Amino acid sequence: MTGSDISHILKEGELEKRSDNLLQFWKRKTCVLTTDSLNIYTDQQKKNKSKELKLQSIKKVDCVEHTGKFVYFTIVTTDNKEIDFRCSDEKNCWNAVIAIALVNFQNRKAIQGFKTQKESENTSLGQQERCMARAP
């Protein structure tokens, strides 16, 4: 990923996040999903960011349960931490949008890696050709 990549907002709205403490209450959070991260705010004005989950640190999105009232899902990070969320109904479908954003991010990263590898190979070939042209 290059510094010139611009994060575009894919989805914005409310999610409920299960707290990490012993009582595990559900707390409503304002969330903004971009092409690079899921930003979680403690307030609706988005002044106080409580967490930023970079897509590169997310391993997968698991849909745990779908009840009549909520869709429950878990984000699993690359260090195997599980963060539980729920959204009010299927129309919100945050889990699907996050999963698609994750796949798109991984595809962009793979393409960038492939391009970098090809550029490196082409540079190496060019250097070899110049060396061979100088040889007696």
Curated annotation (Swiss-Prot):
GO terms for biological process: positive regulation of apoptotic process. It holds the Pfam family PH. Residues 9-103 form the PH domain. GO terms for cellular component: cytoplasm; membrane. It is found in: Cytoplasm; Membrane. It is a peripheral membrane protein. It comes from the Eukaryota. GO terms for molecular function: phosphatidylinositol phosphate binding. Keywords: Cytoplasm, Membrane. Belongs to the PHLDA2 family. The PH domain binds phosphoinositides with a broad specificity. It may compete with the PH domain of some other proteins, thereby interfering with their binding to phosphatidylinositol 4,5-bisphosphate (PIP2) and phosphatidylinositol 3,4,5-trisphosphate (PIP3). Plays a role in regulating placenta growth. May act via its PH domain that competes with other PH domain-containing proteins, thereby preventing their binding to membrane lipids. PANTHER family: PLECKSTRIN HOMOLOGY-LIKE DOMAIN FAMILY A MEMBER 2, PLECKSTRIN HOMOLOGY-LIKE DOMAIN, PQ-RICH PROTEIN. This is Pleckstrin homology-like domain family A member 2. It comes from Danio rerio (Zebrafish). The lineage of its organism: Eukaryota, Metazoa, Chordata, Craniata, Vertebrata. The gene is phlda2.
